[in-house]
UniProtKB/Swiss-Prot annotation:
This is Myosin-binding protein C, cardiac-type. Changing D605N: In CMH4; uncertain significance. Thick filament-associated protein located in the crossbridge region of vertebrate striated muscle a bands. In vitro it binds MHC, F-actin and native thin filaments, and modifies the activity of actin-activated myosin ATPase. It may modulate muscle contraction or may play a more structural role. The keyword Metal-binding applies. The modification Omega-N-methylarginine is found at R1241. It is linked to Cardiomyopathy, familial hypertrophic, 4: A hereditary heart disorder characterized by ventricular hypertrophy, which is usually asymmetric and often involves the interventricular septum. The symptoms include dyspnea, syncope, collapse, palpitations, and chest pain. They can be readily provoked by exercise. The disorder has inter- and intrafamilial variability ranging from benign to malignant forms with high risk of cardiac failure and sudden cardiac death. The modification Phosphothreonine is found at T607. It comes from Homo sapiens. It holds the Pfam family THB. GO terms for biological process: cardiac muscle contraction; cell adhesion; heart morphogenesis; regulation of cardiac muscle cell contraction; regulation of muscle filament sliding; regulation of striated muscle contraction; sarcomere organization; ventricular cardiac muscle tissue morphogenesis. The modification Phosphoserine is found at S47, S275, S284, S304, S311, S427, S550. One of its GO terms (molecular function) is structural constituent of muscle.
Amino acid sequence: MPEPGKKPVSAFSKKPRSVEVAAGSPAVFEAETERAGVKVRWQRGGSDISASNKYGLATEGTRHTLTVREVGPADQGSYAVIAGSSKVKFDLKVIEAEKAEPMLAPAPAPAEATGAPGEAPAPAAELGESAPSPKGSSSAALNGPTPGAPDDPIGLFVMRPQDGEVTVGGSITFSARVAGASLLKPPVVKWFKGKWVDLSSKVGQHLQLHDSYDRASKVYLFELHITDAQPAFTGSYRCEVSTKDKFDCSNFNLTVHEAMGTGDLDLLSAFRRTSLAGGGRRISDSHEDTGILDFSSLLKKRDSFRTPRDSKLEAPAEEDVWEILRQAPPSEYERIAFQYGVTDLRGMLKRLKGMRRDEKKSTAFQKKLEPAYQVSKGHKIRLTVELADHDAEVKWLKNGQEIQMSGSKYIFESIGAKRTLTISQCSLADDAAYQCVVGGEKCSTELFVKEPPVLITRPLEDQLVMVGQRVEFECEVSEEGAQVKWLKDGVELTREETFKYRFKKDGQRHHLIINEAMLEDAGHYALCTSGGQALAELIVQEKKLEVYQSIADLMVGAKDQAVFKCEVSDENVRGVWLKNGKELVPDSRIKVSHIGRVHKLTIDDVTPADEADYSFVPEGFACNLSAKLHFMEVKIDFVPRQEPPKIHLDCPGRIPDTIVVVAGNKLRLDVPISGDPAPTVIWQKAITQGNKAPARPAPDAPEDTGDSDEWVFDKKLLCETEGRVRVETTKDRSIFTVEGAEKEDEGVYTVTVKNPVGEDQVNLTVKVIDVPDAPAAPKISNVGEDSCTVQWEPPAYDGGQPILGYILERKKKKSYRWMRLNFDLIQELSHEARRMIEGVVYEMRVYAVNAIGMSRPSPASQPFMPIGPPSEPTHLAVEDVSDTTVSLKWRPPERVGAGGLDGYSVEYCPEGCSEWVAALQGLTEHTSILVKDLPTGARLLFRVRAHNMAGPGAPVTTTEPVTVQEILQRPRLQLPRHLRQTIQKKVGEPVNLLIPFQGKPRPQVTWTKEGQPLAGEEVSIRNSPTDTILFIRAARRVHSGTYQVTVRIENMEDKATLVLQVVDKPSPPQDLRVTDAWGLNVALEWKPPQDVGNTELWGYTVQKADKKTMEWFTVLEHYRRTHCVVPELIIGNGYYFRVFSQNMVGFSDRAATTKEPVFIPRPGITYEPPNYKALDFSEAPSFTQPLVNRSVIAGYTAMLCCAVRGSPKPKISWFKNGLDLGEDARFRMFSKQGVLTLEIRKPCPFDGGIYVCRATNLQGEARCECRLEVRVPQ
């Protein structure tokens, strides 16, 4: 059996070909096989041909010859040659020998032959072919041999079925006769179509099987009747006949031709208007118009040039003028008509124009490929054809090249007559033209491979950059190597000469890079794929440096540390520190640092020389940040003993100014003191409660001092010497330090010094200023197509400094990058954001900015989508009008927007009025509406508007006013197509017949059955304004009949008729009996069931059961006859038989069963044991797997392996460099199931060399060798 998917290999190297031979000549067929000695059989009509006076068989090596001597008409037909499993068919066609006959006038047309006196049609014997049977029927047995003269002495057939031809719609009968004189029982005949289709299961309207027996001649006649032939019946058929010990079969073919068209008519007779009866006298048709073209004068003139000897010439073979006309261009029609004597040119042209061109019917293909196929990339596709010959070989071509089997890419299948090509894992390379070739015929198709849409898995992000910065857009798609397109504001981007745009692919990621962004690069950038697009906005701003935190004045003492710190908006900006206008050079005491956006100047061990003006100048910007360093000098004066304590502060009137410190900075209060003895210093902070200063939008807003009332509840003692807030006291001063000032450190601090002589006290006010608190979440309003309005409230705390303005940011909902919308501070509490993308969900947030810096961001706003109102709905029309209602319908607007539609609003107003009234409360999601409670007779205008998140769109209004008044409409039933034929329902099934109708006002509906009104509760009628329903909950047989429905409006009505057929299971067959039993066969006979279930009987199912097990097995299904033969029963067993009847509902509930078992007798059998020839299994040794060269490492055990076969078991010997290793203990030899192993224990360099394995038995000797190299590890 050939490997699945591969074409079987033919046994013939040269195949015989069909030939045409003249009658009486010999015909020679030659075939060559692949090898000599192959048994070859020659067949004709399915029977073997043996050497005789008629047939000659010869064989020379691989050449085989069949000679048919003195070929006659009876030898014409189909032949075959068989070698092994290969079978080749060929045909022999016999041509009649040419005879010299005088030229005969063409036969007249049938219409003229019956009407012209003195003319008679030629007899059938002169025409050379038999007349067709009436109504297109023919018989395949007419040309066969008669029953009295059997031509097959070897087989069972007296007469075999012959090949037949029939036209579409005609009938044909195939007959087979079997001699029964020598048969003990009737033969079993089976008819097949193709290889496997048993025609007994196809018996029906188009196919019938008949058999009879002639007792006089003792001949069985079997007939196959085909009626109303269809083109699908064309093909090869087979008749098999079998008896107890004989078997024979016969093959024949059926060809169904298309119905005969006008092209099959005798063109010369149909369009010749004159006859040459009686000495060439011209007879004209009296009804012909004298204006019709007539070539008779030209024909006479042509005949005058002929010589007398022309009449003695042989009559040439008649040509098919119709084929000549079909293939000739229209310009040649007159010449052809003149040449072949066609005088009625106008009638010929009219008939030719009405003819359709018959397509050439394929003889090799029963079913061809479709014109085109489509498959998605990565899927598989199956291309299937169906052949007329089951044994034909096919070739599959791709773009003209034959497809070879390669792995699992292409799979070839052959199942019966079907040939299938399966292409797995289709790629773009498989998009091509494919052809299936059978012999000289082929059918073509095209395969289109569709790529799946490339989807956006990670969209683009909006970006905000400065002029000159690098921009990189990144997007991720679903397919690697996908083709994408970059657009800017709708224009495709390409690689320019300046290489401004760079496109980069990294797997599924695609990058667009702009090395140096310019102001003109701002806009919307999009990446388009076959499955969608990603859109992002690029905003390019001119460079502008913002100062988030400026440097502040410092007052430090000797040996202290001074730190100036500032923060700018750009972390890449460098700067220069100046001291009194001169650049400051860092050293071991002065350090300059730049970390991110923070620039810091640190001076250790401050000296009086460090007191100066310090400035920070950013590079590239006209900006200058300045502050002053104050050095606190301690003066030592001589104080006599017993001096009262005193606090030395340079504060006029002892009312110190407020000390301002930025949150996060270090606060150090160095208070000089004096006194003798040394005073005790006490630091206290007053705990107060007062009003917070409200956030002010502008720095120049007036300050209300009347609302700053404070109440002092208590004082907190500060005495810690370590920690964030600490106090350090020396002999001449007290130092109060706060690391990282916070808002809670703000307040009034009291310094008290005491000694026995007295005390002194000073209050110091410290104010901590900070960035503002984060504002509340902004609110979004007035959302438009690409804009919205953002509103927010001031922060609860302004950080002790007036609010300078606000900064606004936005981002896409699914993104993580916030984009700044403004560089200039917004002074108001609202802003209109523009240049947004419609249909994209955004979020907004806001920052507050004061002199100290920028606050934390506010919480994000509620997500919102910029969207514009939809356009007006389309195709507004009035569907129906009554006395109080109007039905409207429309279609959705052309532009809906990304947010979809919320619904539609419908309004109306009287003609001439401008006030519109809502037709319904709220919105409707449907595109139709019934407006009720309208005044009768009013003329109203209607309009419809579409609504979405952005609000209502433009309205669409009816072109003319609608008059609210009922329109009279004739009643009409619209019977569905499936109700126009007989309605079949099974017993117990519900019946629900819905019939729509039209008519205004509402028609009156009436149902009748067989002319009588419907009665009973089982049948119910339900009517609505537009349809009526006949409903039966459970159908019964009594419900079958003809129903009529009538709709009536006044004197107008319409009727429709329905036929209901309620079917049930049939009753079982009657009188089942065994008519005969012989050999292994039993003949059964029964009568049809009494009740067929009110429908056509499909057939019978015959089953058998062994008496021992009583397990039923099906013998025949869908059997149409009332008698059958059950073959192949087991000898010695008893059988019961039963038969079910079947229709469209199912099988009968019960079966007709035989009452008594039928026993199959056991005949005597003589066992003859078979003789077997002793087989010699001896075989010389041979290595199936030889030794291979190896390189091993010294000290590690190595193995050499090979495999050997032989019978008897060979003796194995191992050699190294010619020395036998059998006595060496360092080598171990193993042999298991033919696998030989030599184990070398811990080899050393001396073990290297050539190793040989020798196998020896009585049949011979074999050896193999290899080289072993032992390497010493380095």
